[in-house]
C-alpha cells in the first residue's frame, strides 16, 4: 500500500480542479457570466437593486417600517424582472450544472474513500462495515 502525504493529495486536488475548470459546464458558465456583464438591462436593474438595498438598510435602522415594506416590494419586483431575462436564466442553469458537477465529485471521492477503507480492512462493502466490525460481530452472540 502506498502512503500519500497531504501535499500529494492537495496537488491531485489542484489537478482535478483544473480538469473541472476545463469542462463544458464551466465553459458555459463563463460565457453566460460574460453575457450578463455585457448586458445593459441587467446592469441597470442590478444597480437599482443595490441602491434600494442600501435604502432598506437605512430604513430598517431608523425603524421606518412602512417605507421599508415599499422598498422591499420594489426590490422583489426588480428581482422578478431580472429573473425573467433569458441570459439570467441561462446563468442560473449553468451555476446549477457546475454545482451538480462539484457535488458529484465530492460524493464520488467520499464514497470511494469509504469503500477503500472497507475493502482494505477486509470488510463487507454490501453492509458498509469495516473488517474490524465484521470480525467482532461474528464473535458476538446475537440477541
From Swiss-Prot:
InterPro entries: Bact_com_dev_regulator, Biofilm_formation_YmcA, Com_YlbF, YheA/YmcA-like_dom_sf. Gene3D superfamilies: YheA/YmcA-like (1.20.1500.10). PANTHER family: REGULATORY PROTEIN YLBF-RELATED, YLBF FAMILY REGULATOR. May work together with YlbF to regulate community development. This is Uncharacterized protein YmcA. The lineage of its organism: Bacteria, Bacillati, Bacillota, Bacilli, Bacillales.
